[in-house]
């Protein structure tokens, strides 16, 4: 059983609710990266597991856009220093293209969720507070402030001040909330008095967006408001004495609500060279979800995140994304093989888990096994078939190349062609930005490389080019011919490969050579390998 199915089953047995609400959330203080997406996709996986079991369930996303800007992040202009302490929803867009700072970072993520196959109801904290959804919770918190203080102090080394109030007020003059302080609360007329460092002071009812609960009180309050029964959380929140531990007690003792079941997830680390660093919007170590959808299929991101348990950390290497796509393609082939097998045989647990995983990570399952052209090979084809002037890929050239590599384009469905074209453009961008950008040597560069070769390698190049004149060029024939001609001349095949890569790419290595040469025009291959003429 896949972990998402097991988790949803466990939650349903424990809660036995009429409706299950699975929640996810993020503070849009910077670029929302694939590490953040792990939370939302984990929630989505468990939600889908509940639906599969026939439960009434819904998936919600809470955007904490009423949190303040905490500091001047490295990606912000200096003039944004004046907005520190203001709610993210009230700060202008840093690039002037969106309604607010929060929207600038939030909207690309929300738009990408549809591509990722996530159907979710979004609640923006600023709208919820302004609409009065938190008013009752604010009153409850203020009237129980000493009890909340006692609960929080039991986890703190230094106790909160005796005059602490569980409320952050948005100053009505300067708009900041990090420099205000509540000095008193009147339970009769439900007003608070606050002062701000800007010099402003007022007595006001802290409702409809005037006041916001601090995180450790806001979180359990929202569980009650939205009826949350399950929620993924990072290991920092789930740590002993963390906000989940205090949230359990505040939810039960202050808001009379049972805390949701927790699903703890590990970080996704971005691998750069030999180092792997946790992604962080504030530090700038990010790979945004919108960036992913430009270089790879959304279902492959779901595969990366959902194939293993949430508690397993992931090292994500952009340079190795082709290997990840290969793994997804292998799962896809296995899925269709098992769908046929189960018509006549009973599948074992491992096989059933593969079916569950593919169905979970693939939002739109094709009717049959679609065309699969390896991602890395697509990156090569895309660069060869690219029209440099229009920057469009010549699909007829692509079909010609594939025909010489064992494919039959006449059998491609419209779905096959569409998916292939998407993979070509995505893999081309990946190769350009993160992978191997294929730059074939011009004639003069090839001549320079030719002069660095041994006499045996030069002789092989000439012999090979002569043989190519007499064959129909395709990947397998080319591969076999390289070995045959090298063997005849007593040249180690490895030396023949090195010679080929040098005159073509100026390197000692490169893509799979048979497929690469079959992707090029026959006349070009003959001319490039016979540089003596």
From Swiss-Prot:
Transmembrane segments: none annotated. It comes from the Archaea. GO terms for biological process: lysyl-tRNA aminoacylation. A motif ('HIGH' region) lies at residues 28-36. Belongs to the class-I aminoacyl-tRNA synthetase family. It comes from Methanococcus maripaludis. A motif ('KMSKS' region) lies at residues 278-282. The keyword Repeat does not apply. GO terms for molecular function: ATP binding; lysine-tRNA ligase activity; tRNA binding. It catalyses: tRNA(Lys) + L-lysine + ATP = L-lysyl-tRNA(Lys) + AMP + diphosphate. Keywords: Aminoacyl-tRNA synthetase, ATP-binding, Cytoplasm, Ligase, Nucleotide-binding, Protein biosynthesis. This is Lysine--tRNA ligase. Disulfide bonds: none annotated. InterPro entries: aa-tRNA-synth_I_codon-bd_sub2, aa-tRNA-synth_I_CS, aa_tRNA-synth_I_cd-bd_sf, Lys-tRNA-ligase, Lys-tRNA-ligase_SC_fold, Rossmann-like_a/b/a_fold. It is an enzyme of class 6 (ligase). It is found in: Cytoplasm. SUPFAM superfamilies: An anticodon-binding domain of class I aminoacyl-tRNA synthetases (SSF48163), Nucleotidylyl transferase (SSF52374).
């Amino acid at each position: 059983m896949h972990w998402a199915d097991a988790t949803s089953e466990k939650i349903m047995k424990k809660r036995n609710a009429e409706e299950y609400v699975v929640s996810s959330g993020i503070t849009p203080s910077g670029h929302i990266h694939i590490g953040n997406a792990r939370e939302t996709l984990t929630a989505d996986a468990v939600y889908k597991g509940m639906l599969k079991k026939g439960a009434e369930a819904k998936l919600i996303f809470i955007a904490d856009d009423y949190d303040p800007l905490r500091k001047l992040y490295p990606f912000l202009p200096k003039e944004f220093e004046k907005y520190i302490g203001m709610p993210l929803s009230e700060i202008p867009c840093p690039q002037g293209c969106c309604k607010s700072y929060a929207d600038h970072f939030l909207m690309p993520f929300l738009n990408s969720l549809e591509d990722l196959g996530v159907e979710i109801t979004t609640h923006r904290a600023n709208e919820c507070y302004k609409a009065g959804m938190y008013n009752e919770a604010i009153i409850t918190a203020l009237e129980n402030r000493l009890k909340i203080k006692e609960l929080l102090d039991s986890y703190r080394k230094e106790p909160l001040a005796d005059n602490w109030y569980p409320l952050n007020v948005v100053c009505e003059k300067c708009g900041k909330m990090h420099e205000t302080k509540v000095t008193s609360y009147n339970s009769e007329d439900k007003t608070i008095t606050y002062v701000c460092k800007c010099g402003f002071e007022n007595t006001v009812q802290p409702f409809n967006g005037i006041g916001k609960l601090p995180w450790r009180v806001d979180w359990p309050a929202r569980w009650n408001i939205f009826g949350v029964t399950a929620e993924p959380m990072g290991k920092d929140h789930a740590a002993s004495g963390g906000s989940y531990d205090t949230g359990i007690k505040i939810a039960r003792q202050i808001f009379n609500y049972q805390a949701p079941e927790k699903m703890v997830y590990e970080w996704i680390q971005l691998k750069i060279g030999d180092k792997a660093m946790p992604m962080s919007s504030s530090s700038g170590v990010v790979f945004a979800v919108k960036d992913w959808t430009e270089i790879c299929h959304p279902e492959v991101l779901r595969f990366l995140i959902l194939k293993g348990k949430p508690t397993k950390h992931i090292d994500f290497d952009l340079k190795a994304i082709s290997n990840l796509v290969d793994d997804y393609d292998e799962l896809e082939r296995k899925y269709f093989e098992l769908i046929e097998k189960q018509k006549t045989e009973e599948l074992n647990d491992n096989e059933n888990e593969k079916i569950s995983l593919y169905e979970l990570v693939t939002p739109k399952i094709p009717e049959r096994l679609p065309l699969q052209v390896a991602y890395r090979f697509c990156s090569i084809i895309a660069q060869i078939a690219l029209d440099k002037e229009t920057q469009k890929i010549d699909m007829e050239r692509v079909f010609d190349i594939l025909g010489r590599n064992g494919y039959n384009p006449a059998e491609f469905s419209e779905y096959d062609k569409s998916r292939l074209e998407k993979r070509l453009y995505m893999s081309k961008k990946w190769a350009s930005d993160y992978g191997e950008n294929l730059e074939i040597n011009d004639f003069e560069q090839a001549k320079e490389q030719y002069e660095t070769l041994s006499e045996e390698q030069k002789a092989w190049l000439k012999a090979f080019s002569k043989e190519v004149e007499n064959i129909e060029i395709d990947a397998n024939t080319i591969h076999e011919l390289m070995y045959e001609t090298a063997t005849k001349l007593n040249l180690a095949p490895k030396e023949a490969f090195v010679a080929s890569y040098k005159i073509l790419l100026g390197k000692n290595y490169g893509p799979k050579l048979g497929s690469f040469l079959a992707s090029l025009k026959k006349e070009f291959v003959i001319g490039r390998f016979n540089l003596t003429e």
